[in-house]
Amino acid sequence: TVKEERYTSGVTQYPPLLSPILALRTPPGTKMVVTGFTGPYKLTDEVRNQNDEIVHICAGSGVVPSFSIIKYDLRVNEKLKHTLVYSNKKHEDIIFDEELAQLKRDFPDRLKVIHTLTREDDPTSFGENIRGGRISQPLLSEAIGSPEKTAVFVCGPDHHPWQKKEAKEKGETLPTSFLQSALGFLAELGVTKDQITKESYG
């Protein structure tokens, strides 16, 4: 069921984009076509052939496209190693927790997963490679090691253009987003822009 999102000027953060079209302008019986992977957030042959490892830095539901890449590549190819740095608030928020654990058992030499939990009192009690706090430069340095022959995929929350516009009009500074933090740390570690594939939501 698709419900129309309402928009009230001055109250709603920004106008809804898709739900009014689906809820109000799409008659019953309309056929929809669901396509495969599109857009820049995908593992191309060029990236696969030029690198030995892919490091994925994700937060929340941003893990979904990277999980698809990891799962497919581990099963279809034999070369690349993958490291996933995955940030959530609570342990119960981890998406694909069991699936990732199974992939680690199936491919112990090719997949490493590091979880960071920002709102757990004792995150290490949940198991190995589970850390507390937000992503940091030392954590990404540990995950990446030497940036040579490494590509990085980053997916997580960033500020929506409407938020940026509103903050600018009010003369306010928005807090640093997950995506901004990750890209800043990567630059400090010497990872170049052409090594990074990014996607955000907000």
Regions found by a protein language model. Give the residues of each.
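A short acidic Gly-Thr/Ser loop motif
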Residues: 59-60, 157
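Short, Lys/Arg- and Gly-enriched loop/turn segments at beta-strand edges
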Residues: 9, 39-48
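Reductase modules of NAD(P)H-dependent flavoproteins
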Residues: 85-202
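Ferredoxin-reductase
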Residues: 1-30, 88-90, 118-120
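Conserved beta-strand elements of the Class I
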Residues: 53-57
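Conserved S-adenosyl-L-methionine
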Residues: 50-52, 74-82
